[in-house]
C-alpha cells in the first residue's frame, strides 16, 4: 500500500493537472454522490490535501471530496477525451478543458461539507500528518510521551495512523534502523538523546522520501537520493556496522533490521 510520500506525490499530480481550472464535466459512480455532479460544473479544485493515506479534494463552492484508496484505488491523469484501456472500475471523473482526473476501484468515497471535516470518523481518528510542514519534532516528542502512546511498542505504534498519519511499513523499517532501535522498544524507555533522534527521524525520513525518491544524483551511492538502507535487503550487509540484515514479522507485517546495531 502506498505510504504518505507516495500519496502526497499523487496529490501533487492531481493539482498540477486541474487545480484552478473550471470543471466542464463531473461524474460519480455511486448514487449518493450523483446529486453533486451538477453542483460542481463550473467550479474548480482549490487544492488537494492529504491526511495520511486519504485525499481531500477541495472545491471552490466549499464542498470536499473525501477518498481513501485503501488497497486497490488509483488516480490517473489523462488528456480530456482520452479513455484509458483498463479493467478497473471507474468511480470518479473530474474533467476540465484540457485535463481529466479519474479515480478507479476505490470504494471509500464521500462528499463532505465544511462542518463535516471535523466530524468525519477517519479524519477525527487520524493523527497529524508527517508531511505537514507545521508539524515539529517537539510536537512529535509530546505525542511519543503522551499517556496514549508512551507504552506502545514501536512495531505497532509506527503503523497506527492515530499516532502519526502517513507512516507505513517501509518508513517504519527505515526510521527504526536510522535511530538504532528495534520494534520492541517503547517511548517510555528511551533516554533523552534517543527520544530526540526518533522525533526528528519520524519527520525527516518521510519528508526526504517525498522530496527525492525517484530522483537521481550521480554523486550519491547507486545514484538514488532516497534509497532503502534495510527494507527488502535481508541477507545483505548493513552499511553502518557490517552485520547481516535480517527479516522477521512484526505486527503482521514484514520487518527488516540489523541485529548488530539495532538494540
UniProtKB/Swiss-Prot annotation:
Gene designation: nei
In short, the EC number is 3.2.2.-, 4.2.99.18
Q: Which GO terms describe its molecular function?
A: class I DNA-(apurinic or apyrimidinic site) endonuclease activity; damaged DNA binding; oxidized pyrimidine nucleobase lesion DNA N-glycosylase activity; zinc ion binding
Q: Source organism's superkingdom?
A: Bacteria
Q: Please tell me whether the keyword Acetylation is annotated for this protein.
A: no
What Gene3D superfamilies does this protein map onto?
1.10.8.50, MutM-like, N-terminal (3.20.190.10)
Q: Which family does it belong to?
A: Belongs to the FPG family.
Carries keyword Ligase? Answer: no
Q: Where is the active site?
A: 2 (schiff-base intermediate with dna), 3 (proton donor), 53 (proton donor), 253 (proton donor)
- Cofactor annotation: Zn(2+)
Give the ZnF (FPG-type) ranges.
229-263
Instruction: Show the catalytic activity.
Output: 2'-deoxyribonucleotide-(2'-deoxyribose 5'-phosphate)-2'-deoxyribonucleotide-DNA = a 3'-end 2'-deoxyribonucleotide-(2,3-dehydro-2,3-deoxyribose 5'-phosphate)-DNA + a 5'-end 5'-phospho-2'-deoxyribonucleoside-DNA + H(+)
> What does it do?
Involved in base excision repair of DNA damaged by oxidation or by mutagenic agents. Acts as a DNA glycosylase that recognizes and removes damaged bases. Has a preference for oxidized pyrimidines, such as thymine glycol, 5,6-dihydrouracil and 5,6-dihydrothymine. Has AP (apurinic/apyrimidinic) lyase activity and introduces nicks in the DNA strand. Cleaves the DNA backbone by beta-delta elimination to generate a single-strand break at the site of the removed base with both 3'- and 5'-phosphates.
What is written in the cofactor note of this entry?
Binds 1 zinc ion per subunit.
Q: Which SUPFAM superfamilies match?
A: Glucocorticoid receptor-like (DNA-binding domain) (SSF57716), N-terminal domain of MutM-like DNA repair proteins (SSF81624), S13-like H2TH domain (SSF46946)
GO terms under biological process? base-excision repair
Binding-site positions, DNA? 70, 125, 169
Name-wise, this protein is Endonuclease 8
Q: Which InterPro entries is this protein grouped with? A: DNA_glyclase/AP_lyase_DNA-bd (IPR015886), DNA_glyclase_Znf_dom_DNA_BS (IPR015887), EcNei-like_N (IPR044091), Endonuclease-VIII (IPR023713), FPG_cat (IPR012319), MutM-like_N-ter (IPR035937), Ribosomal_uS13-like_H2TH (IPR010979), Znf_DNA_glyclase/AP_lyase (IPR000214)
Q: Which NCBIfam families match?
A: PRK10445.1 (NF007763)
* Keywords, ordered alphabetically: DNA damage, DNA repair, DNA-binding, Glycosidase, Hydrolase, Lyase, Metal-binding, Multifunctional enzyme, Zinc, Zinc-finger
This chain's source organism reads: Escherichia coli O139:H28 (strain E24377A / ETEC)
Amino acid at each position: 500500500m502506498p505510504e504518505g510520500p507516495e500519496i502526497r506525490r499523487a496529490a501533487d499530480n492531481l493539482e498540477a493537472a486541474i487545480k484552478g481550472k473550471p470543471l466542464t464535466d463531473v461524474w460519480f459512480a455511486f448514487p449518493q454522490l450523483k446529486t453533486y455532479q451538477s453542483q460542481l460544473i463550473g467550479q474548480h479544485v482549490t487544492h488537494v490535501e492529504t491526511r495520511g493515506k486519504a485525499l481531500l479534494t477541495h472545491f471552490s463552492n466549499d464542498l470536499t471530496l473525501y477518498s481513501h484508496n485503501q488497497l486497490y484505488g488509483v488516480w490517473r491523469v489523462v488528456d480530456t477525451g482520452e479513455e484509458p484501456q483498463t479493467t478497473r472500475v471507474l468511480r470518479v471523473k473530474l474533467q476540465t478543458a484540457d485535463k481529466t482526473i479519474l479515480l478507479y476501484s476505490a470504494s471509500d468515497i464521500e462528499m463532505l461539507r465544511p462542518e463535516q471535516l471535523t466530524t468525519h470518523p477517519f479524519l477525527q481518528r487520524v493523527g497529524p500528518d508527517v508531511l505537514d510542514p507545521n508539524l515539529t519534532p517537539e510536537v512529535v516528542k509530546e505525542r511519543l510521551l503522551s499517556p496514549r502512546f508512551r507504552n506502545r511498542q514501536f512495531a505497532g505504534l509506527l503503523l497506527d495512523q492515530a499516532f502519526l498519519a502517513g507512516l507505513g511499513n517501509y518508513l517504519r523499517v527505515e526510521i527504526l534502523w536510522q535511530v538504532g532501535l528495534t520494534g520492541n522498544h517503547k517511548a517510555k524507555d528511551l533516554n533523552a538523546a534517543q527520544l530526540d533522534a526518533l522525533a526528528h527521524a519520524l519527520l525527516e525520513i518521510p519528508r526526504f522520501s517525498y522530496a527525492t525518491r525517484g530522483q537521481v544524483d550521480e554523486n550519491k551511492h547507486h545514484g538514488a537520493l532516497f534509497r532503502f538502507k534495510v527494507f527488502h535487503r535481508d541477507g545483505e550487509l548493513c552499511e553502518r556496522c557490517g552485520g547481516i540484515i535480517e527479516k522477521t514479522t512484526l505486527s503482521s507485517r514484514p520487518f527488516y533490521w540489523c541485529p548488530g546495531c539495532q538494540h
